[in-house]
């Protein structure tokens, strides 16, 4: 996929912890055969004719609104408080009109300090819900995904994709040394064509142990050792999972 995005967001801070905003963007996207020899192209694995938006050039006008409340004690290395976000976007296909849709994103992070101040219970829940206009589709590259270093860590990047996704994560974090934290984590999540199609039995689960390097105020890197029904996956990253 190749393309360009041009636009602007306007943000308002009525209070230090509260952000309200919106924006207008033009998205020019082109999809086609992959050129990375390490991975098969989409049409080599799936029937390209059945993949929504494959091979189509789309020009979207995206109007968005968002609100965020950030009550974390330290945004770079939180131990208490939380961050709560909601985003709504409307995508208008300016070419064929075949890919008009709405997208709602909800993200909740909450941190519970345990009696020993060197331990924290970190909780995260997120959902992405897309709703195409009557007779339209959501292009595959705009559909929510699960898998990879931030969501269902025991599965490869983009392992699951559909019109709707839900993700729940929990981490028990403790300070092993002044610059090193340990973490036990569990991720569960699901993608589905409709919200009603989501079921508890359809949830995928991953679990594992992680190690995080940090300074007194900032996060530096993490190593997560994740397990799922598809095997073991080590993940070295330089940004926090949440």
Label the predicted regions.
Residues 20, 29-35, 74-76, 95-98, ...:
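Outer-membrane beta-barrel proteins
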Residues 46-56, 60-177, 192:
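C-terminal outer-membrane beta-barrel translocator/porin domains of Gram-negative envelope proteins
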Residues 9-13, 23, 66-70, 109-113, ...:
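Transmembrane beta-barrel domains of outer membrane proteins
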């Amino acid at each position: 996929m190749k393309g360009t995005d041009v636009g602007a967001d306007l943000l308002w801070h009525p209070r230090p912890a509260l952000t309200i905003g919106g924006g207008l963007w033009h998205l020019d996207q082109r999809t086609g055969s992959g050129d990375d020899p390490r991975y098969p192209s989409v049409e080599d694995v799936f029937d390209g004719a059945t993949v929504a938006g494959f091979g189509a050039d789309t020009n979207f006008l995206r109007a968005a609104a968002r609100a965020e409340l950030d009550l974390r004690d330290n945004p770079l290395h939180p131990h208490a408080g939380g961050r709560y976000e909601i985003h709504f976007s409307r995508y208008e296909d300016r070419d064929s009109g075949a890919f008009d849709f709405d997208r709602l994103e909800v993200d909740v992070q909450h941190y519970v300090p345990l009696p020993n101040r060197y331990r924290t219970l970190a909780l995260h829940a997120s959902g992405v819900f897309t709703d195409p206009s009557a007779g339209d589709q959501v292009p595959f590259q705009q559909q929510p995904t699960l898998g990879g270093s931030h969501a269902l860590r025991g599965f490869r990047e983009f392992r699951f994709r559909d019109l709707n996704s839900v993700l729940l994560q929990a981490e028990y974090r403790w300070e092993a040394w002044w610059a090193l934290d340990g973490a036990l984590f569990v991720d569960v999540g699901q993608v589905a064509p409709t919200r009603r199609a989501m079921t508890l039995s359809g949830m995928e689960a991953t679990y594992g142990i992680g190690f995080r390097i940090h300074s007194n105020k900032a996060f530096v890197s993490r190593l997560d050792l994740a397990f799922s029904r598809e095997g073991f996956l080590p993940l070295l990253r330089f940004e926090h999972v949440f």
